[in-house]
Amino acid sequence: MDSKWAAVLLLLLLLRNWGHAEEAGSWGEDQVFAEEDKGPHPSQYAHTPDRIQTPGSLMRVLLQAMERPRRNPAFLFQPQRFGRNAWGPWSKEQLSPQAREFWSLAAPQRFGKK
């Protein structure tokens, strides 16, 4: 857990310094080279600030990666364990008709503090 927080703190510090570097105009040299290379090469290879992800999108990706794994969605669709027809049809060998009605209405009870 501590290593995750250390990684987040390091990333925040890097993003903070990255924002200061952008304000200082560190992209000037890259833009000059991108303008010189525009001739035979497509513009997708030019290294310009528009193509770089914003700090907000980087933070969103980081937070999504740190989310705890959730329960499998199939867990919500478990078959009913109690109530009428929970165990399928009754055979003659199992219970009498009166007992069958009684046990078909059985439901789990919650014991403890209310």
From Swiss-Prot:
Residues 1-21 form the signal peptide. Its main location: secreted. InterPro entries: NPFF. The modification Phenylalanine amide is found at F82, F111. GO terms for molecular function: G protein-coupled receptor binding; neuropeptide activity; neuropeptide hormone activity. Keywords: Amidation, Cleavage on pair of basic residues, Neuropeptide, Secreted, Signal. Pfam families: NPFF. Residues 22-69, 85-100 form a propeptide. Residues 29-51 are annotated as: Disordered. PANTHER family: NEUROPEPTIDE FF (PTHR15044), PRO-FMRFAMIDE-RELATED NEUROPEPTIDE FF (PTHR15044:SF0). Morphine modulating peptides. Have wide-ranging physiologic effects, including the modulation of morphine-induced analgesia, elevation of arterial blood pressure, and increased somatostatin secretion from the pancreas. Neuropeptide FF and SF potentiate and sensitize ASIC2 and ASIC3 channels. Belongs to the FARP (FMRFamide related peptide) family. This is Pro-FMRFamide-related neuropeptide FF. It comes from Rattus norvegicus (Rat). The lineage of its organism: Eukaryota, Metazoa, Chordata, Craniata, Vertebrata.
